[in-house]
């Protein structure tokens, strides 16, 4: 793998993982928390036709349209899913889950934008949740080129899922990624 292509991956392997191993006093390097996936949901009404296209452009992957199964699932209110009066999800097709290379590329963008915009975030036991407003487009040339698609979208809700066991582990992991970005810009 090219180090320039995945700078956060190498930062995690070479610096952050070792730091977490020492600070959290793990006996086994495989216990050190990492990132599992990133879930991205547009803040838009399901009736907006460009919502799916906006997700494909921002996440860098083609989305498959999911058919309705007729089953209902309880919704995470943070994800902004389209819910009925009882709080059940009726449209699951709007979210995109990123893993692997797509997750790495998106995380590089996220860490850059988070340090520039100072967006508020919520750190939970195994996840980091925050909203990215449309200003996110200004920092991504590929998004800015398609502004007409994003003008009706109020932003994105993002959930980063980790393998951490506690909120403190998640906080250390996230702050390590942000320190990597801050170190490069100074």
Curated annotation (Swiss-Prot):
GO CC, alphabetical: cytosolic large ribosomal subunit; mitochondrion
GO biological process, one term: translation
Alphabetically ordered keywords of this record: Mitochondrion, Ribonucleoprotein, Ribosomal protein
Species lineage: Eukaryota, Viridiplantae, Streptophyta, Embryophyta, Tracheophyta
A single GO molecular function term of this UniProt record: RNA binding
Chief subcellular location: mitochondrion
Localization: Mitochondrion
Disulfide partners: none
Name of the protein in question: Large ribosomal subunit protein uL5m
Organism domain of life: Eukaryota
Gene that encodes the chain: RPL5
Keyword Ribonucleoprotein attached: yes
Gene3D superfamilies listed in its UniProt record: 3.30.1440.10
InterPro entries per the UniProt record, alphabetical: Ribosomal_uL5 (IPR002132), Ribosomal_uL5_dom_sf (IPR022803)
Family: Belongs to the universal ribosomal protein uL5 family.
């Amino acid at each position: 793998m090219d180090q320039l292509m995945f700078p956060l991956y190498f930062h995690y392997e070479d610096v952050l993982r070792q730091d977490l191993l020492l600070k959290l006093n793990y006996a086994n390097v495989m216990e050190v928390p990492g990132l599992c996936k990133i879930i991205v949901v547009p803040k838009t009404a399901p009736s907006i036709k460009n919502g799916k296209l906006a997700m494909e452009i921002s996440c860098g992957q083609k989305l498959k349209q999911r058919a309705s199964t007729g089953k209902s699932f309880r919704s995470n209110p943070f994800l902004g899913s389209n819910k009925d009066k009882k709080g059940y999800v009726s449209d699951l097709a709007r979210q995109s889950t990123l893993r692997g290379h797509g997750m790495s590329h998106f995380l590089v963008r996220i860490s850059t934008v988070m340090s520039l915009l100072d967006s508020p975030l919520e750190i939970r036991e195994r996840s980091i949740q925050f909203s990215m407003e449309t200003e996110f487009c200004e920092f991504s040339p590929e998004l800015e080129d398609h502004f007409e698609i994003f003008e009706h979208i109020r932003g994105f809700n993002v959930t980063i899922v980790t393998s951490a066991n506690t909120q403190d582990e998640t906080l250390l992991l996230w702050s390590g990624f942000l320190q990597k970005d801050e170190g490069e810009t100074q």
